[in-house]
Amino acid sequence: MNTADQARVGPADDGPAPSGEEEGEGGGEAGGKEPAADAAPGPSAAFRLMVTRREPAVKLQYAVSGLEPLAWSEDHRVSVSTARSIAVLELICDVHNPGQDLVIHRTSVPAPLNSCLLKVGSKTEVAECKEKFAASKDPTVSQTFMLDRVFNPEGKALPPMRGFKYTSWSPMGCDANGRCLLAALTMDNRLTIQANLNRLQWVQLVDLTEIYGERLYETSYRLSKNEAPEGNLGDFAEFQRRHSMQTPVRMEWSGICTTQQVKHNNECRDVGSVLLAVLFENGNIAVWQFQLPFVGKESISSCNTIESGITSPSVLFWWEYEHNNRKMSGLIVGSAFGPIKILPVNLKAVKGYFTLRQPVILWKEMDQLPVHSIKCVPLYHPYQKCSCSLVVAARGSYVFWCLLLISKAGLNVHNSHVTGLHSLPIVSMTADKQNGTVYTCSSDGKVRQLIPIFTDVALKFEHQLIKLSDVFGSVRTHGIAVSPCGAYLAIITTEGMINGLHPVNKNYQVQFVTLKTFEEAAAQLLESSVQNLFKQVDLIDLVRWKILKDKHIPQFLQEALEKKIESSGVTYFWRFKLFLLRILYQSMQKTPSEALWKPTHEDSKILLVDSPGMGNADDEQQEEGTSSKQVVKQGLQERSKEGDVEEPTDDSLPTTGDAGGREPMEEKLLEIQGKIEAVEMHLTREHMKRVLGEVYLHTWITENTSIPTRGLCNFLMSDEEYDDRTARVLIGHISKKMNKQTFPEHCSLCKEILPFTDRKQAVCSNGHIWLRCFLTYQSCQSLIYRRCLLHDSIARHPAPEDPDWIKRLLQSPCPFCDSPVF
């Protein structure tokens, strides 16, 4: 791997003068402004940011498209909107890969081949109206109709409208595999929901544009019965209105909420649901409600339309606020003319949600500064001792911010602008949901980091300048996105000006830089409230990179982790320990890729001269062995000149081939392997206890389930050194329930009994081998089964006859790495 480029950011790097702010604050739901204390944010030496480049840079096949072409999902997938497809880059922290580069799994969502025609009437009526408008003698009608690509997506003589305008990721846990869904909006206004169910192919689950058009057609293009009857489609104003009310501008997902569903026996059960808000050109907002897991059109629960009253809407975002265990939600809508406000959303049958009584105006001035992007981050106010919401919006080259918190007086609104950040308009903005840090970028390759600092009244921002030219050279930026835990920043770049000249061709790339140090990532993992390795892939990838470079686990991390294991015993810390040991084991493996595959020029001549062979075979073997040693030696010398080979440490592999150096390394590898097996066995036993607990809670006396209960009990008690009181008590209760019944598994080929002697596989007396499901420990006696993302374990598919509690077990992540199972 090439040596990483680093750029230290501090006050000396800051070009513009310290920025000033204009601030106002308001009280109550009306959100009126009052004068407040001045805030003068600027660069500070207390917030130094070390930016490090990560390889590889991912080249894109097509030019990027849309206003915000980059989005990073909660399950660590980056979507890039391009002119022909959506490139999806999945960040994988592969414990089986000794390379130091990022491991990225790349897939693609192709754009539809046929153009999207919005349904504004019957086909014959629409065709007649189009001919009429195209041949109209009124130039205001004919020219407007011919030049509007919403009316003419095919383009006639113009190229078709292909590519994507915007993408939005759902929260984690929405598809059949418990991962994120992708809402995609094409340039010709087709809104679809895509899912990646088998990791290699994306599937379109539903076309919301088509469904919404059919609903409008059935209601005669009226949102309520009180509206006036529909006009004549032959009227050009009515033709425009019908298109405008179903032309999507942006769409955003809400968080997962819980609804109650009534069964046939009048029992209520909690069902997960998610909302998708779609902003249309005329200012209306369609709020779709989907049942989870979302599988298609049958998962649509409802669709309600809200009139925002905002002219020329440009962007929206969900506002979700929690105060004293009471949740409130709304939609933040921004206009191309400048105003921003929060609209109430009435969530019917949603547990624990409350609604605003009236809209809250965050910014009402029609200052002609278009709202390009909006983000909302929940924070905790250290002075007010309550939760609050930070809303930030990119408006031209400025950042508008608004702090909302609920007090006894009502909803308090503090708002202001941060100026002096960029000399060019902001093209992209992203926010770290962990700490509220905001990142903005302009097209000249400059990125700003804004850190919110609370004051007794409201807040101020400390900001740092990140010059990408110090990291990548001269580049232009087109979009940025921060990873879920704030460890990485993804950036779309093209070549910048060289010697005052623009490049002839644009090569679009997705680059990655680090935003945290190894120490910060390790501390965040140890103190994490999530306690799931898969949800923190960006953090553990930083840890992986550090261990692979240094070939040892830092002492402070080992000691802190052992203290966590001793004090809590939570399996999350055991999985973290297993991850560290596996990476350490990979760092000890010798990778002869550069030394052996690349023969030198002299060696090739020797092989050509000696190829006829003069002498015995032993001499030939000796010469070949000598030449191979020369290749290894010269390859290592070349690498040391290039700076790729680091100084050998105590844990690194010896470069010589003597037996004396090999034996300690083999002993160290065997020692690490033994620790890995011990941690894996501990995690296996803990998961077995969980499975047996589910069996005890959900079975009657002597009930036969698909889970090998007796085998699990015998396996846990077979080790005399394993003394777990919880396991012994649980096994005693289960043994009483089973009443001496064994219910053994049988081989499907020869009907022999499958003994439970191995946690990974089952072998019958005739030698038939079946792999075991690591979620239920049943033998997978079929050719089709699921596997976790890192290939740690396998799992069987749920069967129709499985009870609900077994299906819930089969939906669990991998017990070793927390990865989802496909």
From Swiss-Prot:
One term of GO molecular function: DNA binding
Example GO biological process: tRNA transcription by RNA polymerase III
Stored SUPFAM superfamilies: WD40 repeat-like
Annotated positions of the Phosphoserine modification: 19, 604, 611, 652
Compartmental location: Nucleus
Enzyme class, first EC level, given as a word: transferase
Residue list for modification N-acetylmethionine: 1
Highest taxon of source: Eukaryota
Chain residue numbers at which the record places covalent cross-link Glycyl lysine isopeptide (Lys-Gly) (interchain with G-Cter in SUMO2): 225, 629
Disulfide bonds: none
Keywords, sorted A to Z: Acetylation, Acyltransferase, DNA-binding, Isopeptide bond, Nucleus, Phosphoprotein, Transcription, Transferase, Ubl conjugation
Region of interest called Disordered, as start-end residue ranges on this chain: 1-41, 608-663
Keyword Transit peptide tagged: no
Catalytically driven reaction(s): L-lysyl-[protein] + acetyl-CoA = N(6)-acetyl-L-lysyl-[protein] + CoA + H(+)
Keyword Secreted attributed: no
The protein's Enzyme Commission number: 2.3.1.48
A GO cellular-component term linked to this record: nucleoplasm
Entries under InterPro entries matching the protein: DUF5921, GTF3C4, TFIIIC_delta_N, TFIIIC_Znf, WD40_repeat_dom_sf
Major subcellular site: nucleus
Function comment: Essential for RNA polymerase III to make a number of small nuclear and cytoplasmic RNAs, including 5S RNA, tRNA, and adenovirus-associated (VA) RNA of both cellular and viral origin. Has histone acetyltransferase activity (HAT) with unique specificity for free and nucleosomal H3. May cooperate with GTF3C5 in facilitating the recruitment of TFIIIB and RNA polymerase through direct interactions with BRF1, POLR3C and POLR3F. May be localized close to the A box.
UniProt record similarity statement: Belongs to the TFIIIC subunit 4 family.
UniProt subunit comment: Part of the TFIIIC subcomplex TFIIIC2, consisting of six subunits, GTF3C1, GTF3C2, GTF3C3, GTF3C4, GTF3C5 and GTF3C6. Interacts with BRF1, GTF3C1, GTF3C2, GTF3C5, GTF3C6, POLR3C and POLR3F.
PANTHER family for the chain: GENERAL TRANSCRIPTION FACTOR 3C POLYPEPTIDE 4, GENERAL TRANSCRIPTION FACTOR 3C POLYPEPTIDE 4 FAMILY
Protein name listed in UniProt: General transcription factor 3C polypeptide 4
Species name: Homo sapiens
Primary gene name: GTF3C4
